[in-house]
Every structure is written in structure tokens, then in C-alpha cells.
UniProtKB/Swiss-Prot annotation:
GO terms for cellular component: chloroplast. This is Maturase K. GO terms for molecular function: RNA binding. Usually encoded in the trnK tRNA gene intron. Probably assists in splicing its own and other chloroplast group II introns. The gene is matK. One of its GO terms (biological process) is mRNA processing.
């Protein structure tokens, strides 16, 4: 067992780094251990829950035996990759699931060690699982910041770069060779990491491996922030030379001049980027870097990020993937919300003997607004309304029971209201509710071959009214009694800490 320990042995310094398990938070939700290969086969003793490295090595050997069969079939019939087309997807699925299980182990052990060392702090960090926890953070921090960088994370243009960066985390050469063979032989590998092509065959049938590779790539991209903030790398060697060695290894010859310049001015770079008011947030392929500094500092960040992508990932990054916005003048489009910092005037009258004064105090307020046009477009695409937002019947659901139709519409309405509850302006939510409510009525009327007016007159509108006001009933239980909700939904922003992903209709990416 000791000879295999080095393959997934973690540096002890990692155990004190609590940041990286949080980076892989989204990746943890994506893994389904009970799908495909059972997690129990990786346990040496299920009672003690210890990973058996010997069993892991046997899995690698077993997959290599399967790999030999694939190669034999390939040589026997060049036109048919596996010899039998109906077995093609099955073999790919087995290899991808097996490899995903193997490469997950080091990161799982890293997470477990971090959770054990930070057990008391983890209890307070459960709410970080919710993506809504980002917006209270914005409300608290963005009022004191000036500029924000909106970054679209680039995806790797060549899979060899992805495999080579992975080798610094996973030291098992055999499994990496297997991954390289699997990726290069797969017919649809060009759309592996592209965010806009989630519907590809690979991402549908190999979600476990797809999520791991994409989140690993994002983690590698985020390593530059951790390195510059801590002045040390997350690699096994904490010296800056380790990062430079990797840049030299990946960078093409024409980029080495820039890398040397980066090395020469490294101390100056650390001084420039040592900003105590720098904040970083990411969700999927979009990230935000906000700072209290000047526009010059943000332009330097943009310059060094572009050079880092070009040198480290050997790709050309378009400057348009990074936008610099001033918070006081521009809205931030993030996670299906328009967020901005606006000034509210507070006029105070001051009376002094015979004279009175009016004092105007500007107060900053963080404002979040629903992106109504893309949301209506998503509803139109789902056949709930037309492109102008006029409700239409959902013809595909007319064969369902009345209770099922109402339940489906009600669930969508509640989920959207639940997600957009943090909006500062509720008028857009009322419009979405109106579209779904009338679409439900039109669907029921079409099913019963009647008009909407006659249908509602016969059954009454209360059956829909009571159903769609369930959100108000929930709010009456969780809000203090001094909040009056008899006039309608609570108008202030309300963030829920149980939302881990964007609703499909709200996600227009």
C-alpha cells in the first residue's frame, strides 16, 4: 500500500488551505457517487470509510484491459472505431466513469482533511452553498468599491494543455495516459469544454468527467488570484519558481519574453496587487473582480490576466472578454440580475433659531433588478407566451389532468418567485406571474374546449388565486409580525440560502 501512497498523497500544507475546497463546491454538487460506478467499491472497509488505493489501482488495470480490447477492435476495423457501433457509447461511459472516480479521490481527501481541520468554521459556512449568498455579500461590500472587472473565463483550445495541467495534481501517469487516449479518440472532443455546447453527446452522457475537467480548468485559472494574494502557490512547491516552471513548460517560444518580464517585475506586481479591498466572485464561466482602487489598477489587472491566459494556457484571449465598469455609472449583469449602486437622496431639515436649512445627504444603495426581457424570451421559447409577452396555452400539457397542469404552472411560478425574491423592484415579478397564471388558464380552457372567461366564470378565479399566493403565506410565517404583507408580497429584497443553481428559465447563457 505504501508504494501507491505517493499517487494521491497530499501536501500537508494543503490541509490548512480552506479556499480550494470552496472553489470545488460547484464540482462537489455535480458528482453523483451512486451513478455508474458505486462508491462502495472504493472502500476498503465500508464501516471505517477508508479509501483502498489497491482497489483503485485494480480499477486502472481493469480499464487498461478494456482499452486493449478497444485497440484490438480498432485495428480489425478502421471504419468502425469499436468494431461494434452499439458498444461505442458503453465503452466510453465505462472509461469516463472509471477515470472520474479515480481523479476525484485526491480532491475528496483534500476536502475531508479541510473539513476536519475547520470543523467549527464549516458549520458557519453551510449557507455558502447557496448562490444567493453572493448578493448579501454584494450589498455589504460593493457600496464601498469603485470599479469592477467582469470576466468571461476562457476555455482551453487544446486538450493536451488540460491533460498536462492535470498531471500536477494527479501523479498517476497511467490514468493520465488513459485520459489522453480517451479524449483524443472521442469524436466530439472539440466541444468538450465549450460552455455554449452543454447539449453535446459527451456532456450529456459523461457529466461526471465533464464537470470534473471543466471545474479543474476553472480552479487552475483561479490559482493566479490565490498566488498573488498569498504570495505563494497552491502547488507542491510553494516557491514562485514552480509557477514559472509551469509557465515555461506551457508557454510557446514567443511568450517567453513576456514571462521573463513578469518574473523581473514580480515584486512590483505584488505591490500593485496588494489591495485589501479586492473581492473576487465566480459562478460557472463568469467571474467578477471588484476593487476600491483606481481605473489604472483595474487596467493593470486586465493586462496581467490576458498575459497570464496566453502564457499559462497557451491561448489567445480577446480583450473583450474582460470589461471594466464603474459601479456608480454601470449596471452589473450577473446571475440573471442587473445589479447597480445608486444614490438615494435623504433630505433633512435643520432649524436654528430664526433660520432653517435643508441638508441633502446622498446615501448609496445596492439595487438588484430582474432581467425581464431575457426572462420573457425564455418563457416564449418554452411556449408559455409569444415574443411580445402575451400568454398562450401550453398545448403539450393539454393531455394532463387539471391538477397536474395547475401543479406544473404553480411549481414554475413559485420557483421563479423564489429565485427572484431578492429583486428590489417586484413589478417584473408580477408580470411573470401574470403570464404564467393566464397561460395556465388558457391551457385549461383549451383542454375543456372553452374560453378563458367562461372557464374562470364556471370554476371561479379563487382556485388559481389561492394557489399562486402560496409565497405570501410562506412569507407570513418567516417574517416578523411588524411586516405587513396584506397588501401584497413583501417589497424588500429577500435572499434565500437554499438555492444552489439558477432556474432553467432564468438561465439564458
Amino acid at each position: 500500500m505504501e508504494e501507491f501512497q505517493r499517487y494521491i498523497e497530499l501536501d500537508r500544507s494543503w490541509q490548512h488551505n480552506f479556499f480550494y475546497p470552496l472553489i470545488f463546491q460547484e464540482y462537489i454538487y455535480g458528482f453523483a457517487y451512486d451513478h455508474g460506478l458505486n462508491k462502495s467499491i472504493l472502500l476498503e472497509n465500508a464501516g471505517h470509510k477508508k479509501y483502498s488505493l489497491l482497489i483503485v489501482k485494480r480499477l486502472i488495470t481493469r480499464m487498461y484491459q478494456q482499452n486493449h480490447l478497444i485497440l484490438s477492435a480498432n485495428h480489425s476495423n478502421q471504419n468502425d472505431f469499436f468494431g461494434h457501433k452499439h458498444k461505442k457509447n458503453l465503452y466510453y461511459q465505462i472509461i469516463s466513469e472509471g477515470f472520474a472516480v479515480i481523479v476525484e479521490i485526491p480532491f475528496s481527501l483534500l476536502l475531508i482533511s479541510s473539513l476536519g481541520a475547520k470543523e467549527k468554521k464549516i458549520v458557519k459556512s453551510h449557507n455558502l452553498r447557496s448562490i444567493h449568498s453572493i448578493f448579501p455579500f454584494f450589498e455589504d461590500k460593493f457600496l464601498h468599491l469603485n470599479y469592477v472587472l467582469k470576466i468571461l473565463i476562457p476555455y482551453p483550445i487544446h486538450l493536451e494543455i488540460l491533460v498536462q495541467t492535470l498531471r500536477y495534481w494527479v501523479k498517476d501517469a497511467s490514468s493520465l495516459h488513459l485520459l489522453r487516449f480517451f479524449l483524443y479518440e472521442y469524436r466530439n472532443w472539440n466541444s468538450l469544454i465549450t460552455p455554449q455546447k452543454y447539449i453535446s453527446i459527451f456532456s450529456k452522457k459523461n457529466q461526471r468527467l465533464f464537470l470534473f475537467l471543466y471545474n479543474f480548468h476553472v480552479c487552475e485559472y483561479e490559482s493566479i488570484f490565490v498566488f498573488l494574494c498569498n504570495q505563494s502557490s497552491h502547488l507542491r512547491s510553494t516557491s514562485f519558481g514552480a509557477l514559472l516552471e509551469r509557465i515555461y513548460f506551457y508557454g510557446k517560444l514567443e511568450y517567453l519574453v513576456k514571462v521573463k518580464t513578469f518574473t523581473k517585475d514580480f515584486r512590483l506586481i505584488l505591490w500593485l496587487f496588494k489591495d485589501p479591498f479586492l473581492h473576487y466572485v465566480r459562478y460557472r464561466g463568469k467571474s467578477i473582480l471588484a476593487s476600491k482602487g483606481t481605473s489604472l489598477l483595474m487596467y493593470k489587472w486586465k493586462y496581467y490576466l490576458i498575459n497570464f491566459w496566453q502564457c499559462h494556457f497557451s491561448l489567445w484571449s480577446q480583450p473583450r472578454r474582460i470589461y471594466i465598469n464603474r459601479l456608480s455609472k454601470h449596471s452589473l449583469d450577473f446571475m440573471s440580475f442587473f445589479s447597480s449602486v445608486r444614490l438615494n437622496s435623504s433630505v433633512v431639515r435643520s432649524q436654528m433659531v430664526e433660520n432653517s436649512f435643508l441638508i441633502d445627504n446622498p446615501i448609496k444603495k445596492f439595487d438588484t433588478v430582474v432581467r425581464i426581457i431575457p426572462l420573457v424570451g425564455s418563457l416564449a421559447k418554452a411556449k408559455f407566451c409569444n415574443v411580445l409577452g402575451h400568454p398562450v396555452s401550453k398545448s403539450a400539457w393539454t393531455d394532463l389532468l387539471d391538477s397536474d397542469i395547475i401543479d406544473r404552472f404553480g411549481r414554475i411560478c413559485r420557483n421563479l418567485s423564489h429565485y427572484y425574491s431578492g429583486s428590489s423592484r417586484k413589478k417584473s415579478l408580477y408580470r411573470i406571474k401574470y403570464i404564467l397564471r393566464l397561460s395556465c388558464a388558457r391551457t385549461l380552457a383549451r383542454k375543456h374546449k372553452s374560453t378563458v372567461r367562461a372557464f374562470l366564470k364556471r370554476l371561479g378565479s379563487e382556485f388559481l388565486e389561492e394557489f399562486f399566493t402560496e409565497e405570501e403565506k410562506v412569507l407570513s410565517l418567516i417574517l416578523p409580525r411588524n411586516f405587513s404583507i396584506s397588501r401584497g408580497l413583501y417589497r424588500g429584497p429577500l435572499w434565500y440560502l437554499d438555492i444552489i443553481c439558477i432556474h432553467d428559465l432564468a438561465n439564458d447563457e
